[in-house]
A protein has these predicted regions:
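Conserved catalytic/acceptor-binding region of the Class I
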Residues: 137-196, 205-216
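Conserved alpha-helix/loop element of class I SAM-dependent methyltransferases that forms part
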Residues: 22-43
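Class I SAM-dependent methyltransferase SAM/SAH-binding core
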Residues: 48-102
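N-terminal, positively charged/glycine-rich alpha-helical extensions of SAM-dependent methyltransferases
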Residues: 1-15, 29
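A short SAM/SAH-binding and catalytic strip from SAM-dependent methyltransferases
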Residues: 109-123
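A short glycine-rich, Lys/Arg-flanked "PGG" loop and its adjoining helix->strand segment in the class I
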Residues: 124-136
């Protein structure tokens, strides 16, 4: 995974992400609700969020919880100006880094990541490694995308991430964690035209692994 390219694409999309990322917003709200339901308040004291972006999930979470300390992380330092309202709170801090290095303080009660780990080189290794950062009774909560994500575009370009199925993830995680909740859901977006699809992907940074621009032939094929 070219992290430099991914960072550059998301940095370019940071201004439009919060407006255009409709699916990610739905996921963020559902995940925040699930954490409130399945994780006791004592498990939300010291929190680490991986891949916070512009704070979409963060704000949803903070409407439902009041952690004593919240460390926000993202690959892109360019997101920090979009977090200024959150960082005005002395309990909340931001650090830009590649989260896969797992260079974070231990003693976390909760590690969360919303719609981010699909961009990791070794998501399973990262998720297993989070165990050593958690307290003995700590929780790991995350959402990601599955193999059916943007399949219409993938069928044409073959540009795709190595998405994991829910079963693949639960099989791996069962060795390190007791799974208290898992869910898979298909969310559908409709667009007025094929070009609107591509615009949406660009404005949400989802073109992060494609190195070249679309050719005229690819564009014509996609629009048919």
């Amino acid at each position: 995974m070219d992290k430099t390219l991914i960072r550059r694409r998301f940095a370019k999309a940071v201004g439009s992400y919060s407006i255009r990322a409709d699916v990610q917003r739905q996921i963020a709200y559902h995940m925040a609700d699930a954490i409130g339901k399945y994780i006791p308040s004592g498990g939300r004291r010291n929190v680490l969020e991986i891949g916070c972006g512009t704070g979409m999930f963060t704000r949803a979470f903070l409407h439902r919880a009041t952690p004593e300390r919240l460390l926000l992380n993202d690959l892109c330092p360019e997101v920090e100006p979009y977090l200024t309202d959150l960082l005005a709170n002395k309990r909340i801090h931001f650090a830009a880094s590649d989260a896969e290095a797992l260079n974070f303080p231990s003693g976390q009660n909760l590690i969360v990541s919303c719609s981010a780990i699909q961009w990791f080189d070794q998501p399973e290794k990262f998720l297993a490694g989070c165990r050593k950062l958690l307290t003995a009774d700590g929780y790991l909560a995350f959402s990601t995308f599955g193999p059916q994500n943007v399949k219409e575009v993938v069928s044409l370009t073959s540009d795709t991430l190595p998405y994991r199925s829910l079963k693949e993830l639960t099989d791996v995680l069962s060795a390190e964690y007791q799974i208290v909740y898992s869910r898979e859901e298909k969310l559908k977006l409709s667009f007025a035209s094929p070009l609107e699809v591509l615009k949406h992907l660009k404005e949400t940074g989802v073109t992060g692994i494609r190195r070249q621009s679309w050719t005229r032939g690819e564009l014509d094929d996609f629009c048919r």
